[in-house]
Swiss-Prot record:
Gene3D superfamilies: IHF-like DNA-binding proteins. The lineage of its organism: Bacteria, Pseudomonadati, Pseudomonadota, Alphaproteobacteria, Rickettsiales. This is Histone-like DNA-binding protein. SMART domains: BHL. It comes from Rickettsia montanensis. Belongs to the bacterial histone-like protein family. GO terms for molecular function: DNA binding; structural constituent of chromatin. GO terms for cellular component: cytosol. InterPro entries: Hist_DNA-bd, IHF-like_DNA-bd_dom_sf.
Amino acid sequence: MTITKEKIAAMLSSKLGFSNNLCEEIVHTVFSNILEIAKEQKLTLKNFGSFEVKQKNPRPGINFHTKAPVIIESKKNLRFVPSSKLKALINGSTR
């Protein structure tokens, strides 16, 4: 299931009674701050999980069309590790 920030804001608005515009601004601000923090360092959201940017080193590879060796450049990957409470919630156990 894919959910948009607008849908999250609409759910907040109906649940809390705030205006939809205010809730959209809150959701946008929260996600923007999470992204900014996660770019710089490991970010852990208690009872949810951790986001961390990992640097992948360059490595040798093969061009599938020409079979020639190539170097795959380094890149950054975002890694998410769910918390044990989130895993338990998904798997149906209550802890």
